């Protein structure tokens, strides 16, 4: 909670406003609180984590292409240059990841992508999960 820049609070209006008031009174840095229904709040969380998983998956694929092309730059230099575009940034572009392995292995990402897949059967979400399983099997 300490580093959070915003909160999405889902539930009935009275309960959500009460929670929001508690957050505002305890966490002075929080300026942006949005209130919505519980389903929308859940979809926001799942969508954020799915997007982050997709970024990791995307950059793992780009890493393979960078190596295959025989680029003279290191992947780290390359990723930094790509991230200079403010629309892209540096977030979730490190390959291998912080655990020294390819792909992602996060309880929240795994759980939230599973939930999102269950809701709508999205072929994109399914493919992200399949590619990640492939990436995780690669030895770094």
Summary of predicted features, one role per range:
Residues 1-140:
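Structural/interface elements that position substrates and couple domains in central-metabolism enzymes
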């Amino acid at each position: 909670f300490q580093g959070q820049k915003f909160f999405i609070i889902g539930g009935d209006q009275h309960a959500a406003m009460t929670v929001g008031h508690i957050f505002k009174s305890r966490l002075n840095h929080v300026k942006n609180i949005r209130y919505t229904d519980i389903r929308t709040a859940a979809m926001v969380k799942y969508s954020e984590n799915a997007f982050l998983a997709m970024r990791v998956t995307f950059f793992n694929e780009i890493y393979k292409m960078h190596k295959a092309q025989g680029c003279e730059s290191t992947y780290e230099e390359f990723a930094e240059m790509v991230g200079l575009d403010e629309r892209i940034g540096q977030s979730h572009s490190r390959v291998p990841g912080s655990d020294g392995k390819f792909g992602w292995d996060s309880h929240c990402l795994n759980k939230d992508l599973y939930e999102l897949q269950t809701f709508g059967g999205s072929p994109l979400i399914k493919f992200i999960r399949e590619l990640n399983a492939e990436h995780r099997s690669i030895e770094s």
